[in-house]
Amino acid sequence: MEELRGYLEIDRPHQQRFLYPLLFQESIYALAHNHGLNGSILYEPMEDLGHDKKSSSLNVKRLIIQMYQQNHFIISFNDSNQNRFLGHSRNSYFQMVSEGFAVIVEIPFSMRLVSSLEKGSESHNFQSIHSIFPFLEDKLSYLNYVLDILIPHPIHLEILVQSLRQWIRDLPSLHLLRFFLHEHQNWNSFITTNTKKCSSFFSRENQRLFLFLYNFHVYQFESLFVFLRKQFFHLRSISFGSFLERTHFYGKIENFVVSMRNHSQNILWLFKDLFMHYVRYKGKSIMASRGTYLLMNKWKSHLVNFWQFRFYFWSQPGRIHINELSNHSFYFPGYLSGLRLNPSMVRSEMLENSFMIDAVIKRFDTVVPTIFLIGSLAKVKLCNVSGHPISKSVWADSSDSDILDQFGRICRNLSHYHSGSYKKHSLCRIKYILRLSCARTLARKHKSTVRAILKRLGSEFLDEFLTEEQEILSLIFPKTPFHSGRIWYLDIIRIHSLANH
């Protein structure tokens, strides 16, 4: 790591032009396989892949030469059964080089992020997903309309390569990136309009590289809001370019290349809104404003045109929905959120006269999406589409303790994430489904009945589904029922797969 940092510190003005030689340094591949950097991305053990033999610069050079020389219409890297390279499958070598290449292309953006954090101490980086909701709770109560946006991602990858040229001027690296994109078996999935096929594009083998490309695409999309904000508020910008799974609220850009400045001065007056707020998680974002419906409709029209002329991508206007906050709930992320109107009567007395005043208080409300959660449980075969619990036959061969641990972990994760809901009674149904599904799985394993399993396990069975916050809150607030409290945790950096249906 120190060697890599030293290389980058030698000549900062020219470092973007010499990324390609880094591909032949073995320290890059050791960095790529560092689990601390890759987070939840799973990789095969080093001993299974023969990492010491594979990551030599000679092997990498031979692989890249063959990539340039091969006939793309005859040979495919993804045919691991027929194509072998030095005793290993081509696919494993392709995976190894793509991992190293992903680290290399992140370097210019990571260096900007580090330099920005050193210069600006007021930049906030909230890692917890739950930190989004206190922000919404403080802001949305005073706003009127919300734009529910699905960010268009099925664009042609050549557009991403062209966009990267603004930041990376190393042409060999960009050419190599094109080879990676054409060689990948799911290359066409990214340019299709089928969302389910697009999700398969981020494969296990090349997840880091394509996650980088997707985040860069979203970064280009969000640059519009930064540009407009700078025009009105004249704030000094700082960098933003982290490609890990984090949540950034106050990310701004330094040295942003504005390609539309000459054409935007005539339309900026349409979007001057001091109360516009923007929040995004993954491919979904919301824009809330205190303005009128006409203003929000202008924003919608401009976003569609921006996607078309900036990314050469035709986006249907139906991907953006305008809704009034007081009459609409939006799904973001893992919650059904909206504004609840609480009417109240206030009595005011003045001398001998008294007045009754009707007051309405807006409160940001978060509800557990029971239907979505049941659909997620049905997908993993824990219940049917009606919510009726069924046994998990795949886990029937595991030990009793492993089965209890699996179901208990799912229950605790869902309860932990949805602890911010005002009413948690709907979670009781989800816990009931998980408990009964667990009991049926154990009964299937032992060829017994659910009643016999519950009688044999007793309190041990229920303890597996008791969450920590229930125990802690009962001690801190003994008079406050757990279902009426709302807690936001600052240690949640990702949504459980069942919660993010």
From Swiss-Prot:
Q: Which residues form a coiled coil?
A: none
**This protein's GO CC annotations:** chloroplast
Q: Which UniProt keywords apply?
A: Chloroplast, mRNA processing, Plastid, RNA-binding, tRNA processing
Question: Major place of localization?
Answer: plastid
Family annotation (InterPro entries): Domain_X, Maturase_MatK, Maturase_MatK_N
Keyword Plastid among UniProt keywords:
yes
Query: Key word Metal-binding present in the record?
Result: no
> What are the recorded Gene Ontology BP terms?
mRNA processing; RNA splicing; tRNA processing
One of the record's GO molecular function terms: RNA binding
Q: Tell where it localizes.
A: Plastid, Chloroplast
The function of this protein is: Usually encoded in the trnK tRNA gene intron. Probably assists in splicing its own and other chloroplast group II introns.
What protein family is recorded? Answer: Belongs to the intron maturase 2 family. MatK subfamily.
Q: What is this protein called?
A: Maturase K
Q: Which organism is it from?
A: Amborella trichopoda
Gene name in the database record: matK
